[in-house]
Design a protein with these regions (language model features):
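Extended aliphatic helical segments
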Residues: 3, 20, 25-28, 45, ...
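Glycine-rich, proline-tolerant flexible connector loops at the mouths of alpha/beta enzymes
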Residues: 4-35, 96
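Short histidine/acidic/glycine/proline-rich micro-motifs that form metal-
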Residues: 9, 22-24, 53-58, 92-95, ...
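Active-site acidic/histidine proton-transfer and metal-coordination neighborhood
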Residues: 33-49, 55-163, 173-174, 184, ...
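Histidine-acidic metal/acid-base catalytic patches
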Residues: 1-2, 7-11, 41, 82-84, ...
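Short amphipathic alpha-helical segments, especially helix-boundary/capping motifs
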Residues: 9-14, 30, 48-52, 86-89, ...
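Serine/threonine-rich low-complexity intrinsically disordered regions
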Residues: 24, 29, 94-97, 196-200, ...
Length: 277
């Protein structure tokens, strides 16, 4: 068993499913690190990654600087805990074009990855567009969303410590092939999410692809959406993926109580056990 441990700064969450601090990297002493590792060992759980998903290319320069500074703290914590992995976003200047954002990526990200290399940590970027509703309009908050953009990012930053946290669900609502990129980018896949999404064609037909995505799709537990998990896991085995796979729960139907949240994990685990040992 494993867990992707969230490491947001302490304080009020700025968005849904963010702001959680399983590990306070600001106060991570050697003693606290030893306690965390001992706690995990007692329960038979490994840390797959330390997670912090900010916008490191935020148009607000003060927020950008704070996000980058905290990301570096998460990298240091990953080294201290012997995890060697950080999962995150590259971010995006929401009101700028893809081309402008690639130039911003060229400026911001090589130093971050160089820092990670110095501390023997890999950085895995999730392919979530962070484009859901009016708060993310017009371009979303993460550039790293499609195979075409991945290629261009890897041309700019070919470091072996820079790779992908692959989530098939984000391709579902973009109506893209979520299997083929696994083969093309097999050497860049460092971490994997198991999350599903349900696309509602009748809603899409009414509002169109230019609408806010949450108007025509909904995150679901694995097996309750449109991902073919047999095909997905088959592709992962084809490419020889042997890294961590983490269930990510964002299904609103399983909110409201601690028991419902636990049910979401139990059901996801039970469903995926037919594919994963």
């Amino acid at each position: 068993s494993c867990v992707e441990a969230a490491c947001w700064p302490s304080g009020k969450a700025e968005r849904r499913y963010a702001g959680v601090s399983h590990i306070d990297v600001d106060g991570l002493t050697d003693e606290k690190a030893a306690y965390i590792l001992g706690y995990c060992k007692e329960r038979g759980v490994e840390l797959s990654s330390l997670a912090f998903y900010p916008n490191t290319m935020d148009e607000d320069l003060e927020k950008r600087a704070a996000n980058i500074a905290h990301l570096k703290k998460v990298i240091l914590a990953s080294e201290k805990l012997g995890v060697g992995m950080v999962t995150t976003f590259v971010g995006r200047a929401t009101h700028k074009t893809v081309e402008e954002n690639l130039e911003l990526f060229r400026e911001i990200w090589p130093p971050i990855v160089a820092f990670a290399e110095e501390h023997h940590v890999k950085v895995a970027i999730e392919n979530c567009p962070m484009w859901f509703d009016a708060t993310n309009w017009p371009g979303g908050q993460n550039l790293f969303t499609t195979p075409d953009i991945w290629r261009r990012c890897f041309e700019i930053l070919p470091s072996p410590n820079f790779g992908i946290n692959y989530d098939p669900s984000h391709f579902i609502w973009q109506q893209m092939d979520y299997i083929r990129p696994l083969y093309e980018f097999k050497d860049r896949i460092f971490h994997v999410h198991y999350k599903d999404i349900k696309l509602y064609p009748e809603k899409l037909a009414r509002v169109g692809v230019m609408a806010y995505p949450l108007q025509y799709m909904e995150p679901k537990l694995p097996g309750l959406g449109d991902v073919s998990w047999a095909k997905y896991v088959s592709a992962l085995t084809d490419i020889g993926y042997s890294g961590y796979t983490c269930i990510e729960v964002e299904d609103r139907a399983f909110e409201g109580s601690r028991e419902r949240i636990l049910d979401s994990l139990r059901l996801s685990k039970r469903y995926l056990e037919q594919y994963v040992i």
